[in-house]
Amino acid sequence: MVRVTVRYRATVIWTRTGGADDGPLLVLLHGLGGTGELWRGLEALLPDAWAGGWVVPDLPGHGRSATASSYDFGVQAALVAEALPDDRDLVLVGHSMGGMVALAMAGRLDRVQRVVGFSIKTYWPAPHVEGMRGQSLKPARVFPTREEAVERYLLASGLRGLADPGAPEHAAGIREVPGADGGWRIAQDMGTFDFGVPDMPALLDDVSCPVTLARGSEDVMVREENYAGLGVEVVTWDGLGHNPHVEDPAAVVALL
């Protein structure tokens, strides 16, 4: 696997690639607060399950990617698309916010063959949106120790209780603050919390390829009725929560 950086309007998208150099390219898009490292368990299964290649980005303002001037789904989709080869058909897999980015990409790129989105929160009343916007205006908290910053990253990415705090891949989710009064903070740009008003029906209207939506039966953020009436295939994983790709990567691979 190699690291590839691509510049687009002064924004750098970090990616990791694997698999074959031809055939459909699987694009794995993490959720809010995460990094591409959340796909490690699923990637380990791909050599035996996916004949093409795959690419794992850190979304704008997350992990090792640079910040962006806006985190609207369409802007994120354009930035990620610029980091991908333009001669490959694409299959997009997105978790939570990454699922919205995947749908926005599919609405703009004719070469997207399929979208699999899971754990996508579709119910966004105005107070929720305003709460997220308010969060985006707060400075990132600086912690005196690296271990405390890792704990904050695990909370922000939904990994607390699911991942070993000592695992080396969490380094992608934090960064050291320079200076005499420095410390450690999460790498996520707080501006990423302001991504606008999610509109699943509008995103789906622009997509012409097949779409599968999935959720864990124990996911309190995404209920079965939230996916009702959207006119796409819906899969429910029994016993899984909001992070099925971490809890049971094989269940997600099975959808491919």
How would you name each of these model-derived features?
Residues P144-P198:
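Conserved alpha/beta-hydrolase catalytic His-Asp/Glu region
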Residues R111-R146:
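Flexible "cap/lid" loop of the alpha/beta hydrolase fold
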Residues L29-G31, H95, R215:
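The conserved beta1-alpha1 loop
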Residues L240-P249:
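Catalytic histidine-centered segment of alpha/beta-hydrolase-like enzymes
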Residues V177-L230, T236:
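Conserved serine/cysteine hydrolase catalytic core
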Residues W50-V93, A254:
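Active-site loop/oxyanion-hole signature of alpha/beta-hydrolase fold enzymes
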Residues R16-A66:
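Conserved HGGG/HGGXW glycine-rich cap/lid loop of the alpha/beta-hydrolase fold
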Residues G94, G98, A102:
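Gly/Ala-rich beta-loop-alpha elbow adjacent to hydrolase catalytic centers
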